[in-house]
Amino acid sequence: LPLGFYECPYPYKRILSPKVVEFCADSGRFYFLKDTCCDIEGIRKKLEIMKGSNMKLYNANTSTLLESMKYGAAGYSGVMANFHPALYAWLLENWEKEPEKAEYLQDILTPCSFIELKNYPLSAKTYLAKEIGFSIKARTRKNTADYISETELSELRQIKELSDRAME
């Protein structure tokens, strides 16, 4: 049975040590690591350990994403894909072919990712419903505010506008 790990980013940061990553990679049973360390040197070390194994690293942090891809990360597995799935897909598919545009896009996506710190996941569900047009209700089991303020709605609209311009 192929297994994977999701490092816990919140509320208590739980990151796999290089020793644990080595054990998992050497076992042959682990195929997936959602990395949440947000540290390119830590990511680079894990990728070096996993080289040649079944285990693949998926970065959850936007600001280190492009550099992690250059070191061999397999992809992205962060919550911001709830806001910008097409932009992350483009980045992952085209970063080698169009490196300057990929850098530009990451420069936009990184500050956009700060919205994650405000009322997530309700903000993502509201964004998908109001800005993208998905037919979903903005409900969540997480203990956050039960509404999005006008300021937050304005921020979500601005993120949508910025992400639309990013692909022009």
Features from the language model and the residues they span:
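Short beta-strands and strand-loop turn motifs
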Residues: 2-8
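Catalytic alpha/beta core domains of metabolic enzymes, predominantly
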Residues: 8-118
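C-terminal alpha-helical cap/extension of soluble enzyme domains
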Residues: 73, 80-168
